[in-house]
Amino acid sequence: MKRVIVIGGGLAGLIASIRLARWNIACTVVEKKKYPFHRVCGEYISNETVPFLQKEGLYPETFDPPQINRFQLSSVNGNSTTLPLDLGGFGISRYQFDHFLYEKAKEAGVDFLLDTEVETVDFTGDTFEIKTSNRSIAAPIVIGAFGKRSRLDHYLDREFFKRRSPYVGVKYHVHTHHPSNLIALHNFRGGYCGISNIE
């Protein structure tokens, strides 16, 4: 049986691997970290994904994620408005959600190479060769779900990798009194701060 290699074990890589395994397609996910771990990423998931997640048995209901249906926007000068968020969403940490999907992937039969970073990917004939620091693996199909600004982006000589961004992203979890159904976006000079509840 031919194997699919998925590079990157975030939401896209994990869900792709689960679906492949459920279609009886052998799949290996290569992830540079070990689960569970935090990601610098928004932790608001739109409700447009809920029917799919429920159909696939991947909705994280065991965490009782807060249901978010209000949106607050503030300007640099401090003016703000709050309005209904029609479609809405739910809040869950990537620490929990990714680990939840990782466990689901293992149940489905997905193989994992954790704590392993892909250094190069080359295509010869009809086969991809993936090299890490300590091994080489081959597959006819590779899914790149590794996000942006990775070692592979550098190896593939992608243009955006050469242009450094003047921005930085920071995620911080705090205990505070914030309405569980509200996602807020507060703007300040040169950036913004998003606040929403998680499980």
Region spans (language model):
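Beta1/beta-strand and adjacent pyrophosphate-binding region of the FAD-binding site
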Residues: 1-12
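Glycine-rich FAD pyrophosphate-binding loop
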Residues: 7, 18-41
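Conserved Rossmann-like nucleotide-cofactor binding loop
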Residues: 12, 35, 149
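Short alpha-helical segment within the catalytic ATP-binding CA
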Residues: 14-15, 47-48
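Hydrophobic/aromatic ligand-binding patch that stacks against planar heteroaromatic rings
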Residues: 15, 19, 142
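Predominantly flavin-linked oxidoreductase catalytic cores and closely associated redox partners
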Residues: 23, 104-199
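Residue-level detector of anion-binding/catalytic polar loops
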Residues: 26-27, 59, 111
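A conserved beta-strand/loop capping segment in the N-terminal third of enzymes
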Residues: 49-104, 123
